[in-house]
Swiss-Prot record:
InterPro entries referenced in this protein's UniProt entry, alphabetically: LS, LS/RS, LS/RS_sf
Catalysed conversion reaction: (2S)-2-hydroxy-3-oxobutyl phosphate + 5-amino-6-(D-ribitylamino)uracil = 6,7-dimethyl-8-(1-D-ribityl)lumazine + phosphate + 2 H2O + H(+)
Lineage, top ranks: Bacteria, Bacillati, Bacillota, Bacilli, Bacillales
SUPFAM superfamilies listed in its UniProt record: Lumazine synthase
Protein name, per record: 6,7-dimethyl-8-ribityllumazine synthase
Family: Belongs to the DMRL synthase family.
Gene: ribH
Residues that bind 5-amino-6-(D-ribitylamino)uracil: 22, 56-58, 80-82, 113
Binding site for (2S)-2-hydroxy-3-oxobutyl phosphate: 85-86, 127
Organism: Bacillus velezensis (strain DSM 23117 / BGSC 10A6 / LMG 26770 / FZB42) (Bacillus amyloliquefaciens subsp. plantarum)
Length: 154
């Protein structure tokens, strides 16, 4: 049996990151976690490009455009959606998740889902580097692994 898996060495990888500006006090921490993790795994600073978009709903569009350029080994998406009093949360979360999945399958470039979806601001803050780790850092590790896995299929 052959086992195919990506390693966690970022040397030589080019990574795109799409970040939603809405709830920027949280998404900026997710971005910092992602950038720090990429650098610690060997990705060069000049091989990381960041595109800011208005919010989570716009992330799939930019992620797909970024992936379509074929300049990136992986694209990380970072955003935060916090439930409010209306159904807006459900629509944004569902459509963003679908769009991000489609961006990866349509382009053949790994697109990593890093949208934090929570019931409260406190839960979002926890996932941006306090009690529950940093989702941006987790996504960076996934991006490196998937980029290297994808290369093994070429």
């Amino acid at each position: 049996m052959n086992i195919i898996q990506g390693n966690l060495v970022g040397t030589g990888l080019k990574i795109g990151i799409v970040v939603g500006r809405f709830n920027e006090f949280i998404t900026s921490k997710l971005l910092s976690g992602a950038e720090d993790t990429l650098l610690r795994h060997g990705v060069e600073s000049n091989d990381i490009d960041v595109a800011w978009v208005p919010g989570a709903f716009e992330i799939p569009f930019a992620a797909k455009k970024m992936a379509e350029t074929k300049k990136y080994d992986a694209v990380i998406t970072l955003g935060t959606v916090i439930r409010g009093a209306t159904t807006h949360y459900d629509y944004v979360c569902n459509e963003a998740a679908k769009g991000i999945a489609q961006a990866g399958t349509a382009t053949g470039v790994p697109v990593i889902f890093g949208i934090v979806t929570t019931e409260t601001i406190e839960q979002a803050i926890e996932r941006a580097g306090t009690k529950a780790g940093n989702k941006g850092a987790d996504c960076a590790v996934s991006a490196i692994e998937m980029a290297n896995l994808n290369r093994s299929f070429e």
